[in-house]
Design a protein with these regions (language model features):
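Short, exposed beta-strand/loop patches in secreted or surface proteins that constitute
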Residues: 22-24, 32-36, 58
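Flexible, glycine- and charge-enriched loops at secondary-structure boundaries
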Residues: 8, 55, 100
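Alpha-helix N-cap recognition
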Residues: 61-62
Length: 122
């Protein structure tokens, strides 16, 4: 019986590069991306002992993995900026909108940095 493969070797190499580009995120939050072989890559989020991770998402497309990790990175940065302030009640979009334009530009500019490291064209 032949086992089904859900990700090509080419896409697997691209996903690996994307996952490696976001090491900064893994140090900021309880998030990790794991290569699960023929199944693709799994993003594990919010570790809660003794049960393990609260959420998981499986990726077989490097572009989708990049966008998922980018959104997690941006949300975490916005959360850390607004932590403990009533500003967080507005949600991440509200926090972002309340930032000065210069700070917004810096955050958005980081997406290009991550894309370059990950080999993703924006």
């Amino acid at each position: 019986m032949e086992k089904q493969v859900y990700i090509t070797e080419e896409e697997r190499a691209k996903c690996k590069k994307v996952a490696e580009a976001f090491t900064e995120l893994y140090e900021m939050a309880d998030i990790v991306v794991v290569d699960v072989g023929r199944y693709g890559f799994v993003m594990l989020k919010y570790y809660m002992p003794p049960h393990g991770f609260e959420e998981d998402e499986t990726y077989t497309d490097s572009r989708a993995l990049f966008e998922g990790l980018w959104q997690e990175w941006l949300d975490m940065k916005l959360y850390l900026m607004a932590k403990g302030a009533p500003l967080l009640e507005k949600g991440y979009k509200g926090v972002f909108a309340s930032l000065p334009e210069e700070k917004q530009s810096i955050l958005i500019g980081r997406k290009a940095d991550f894309a370059e490291r990950a080999g993703i064209d924006l």
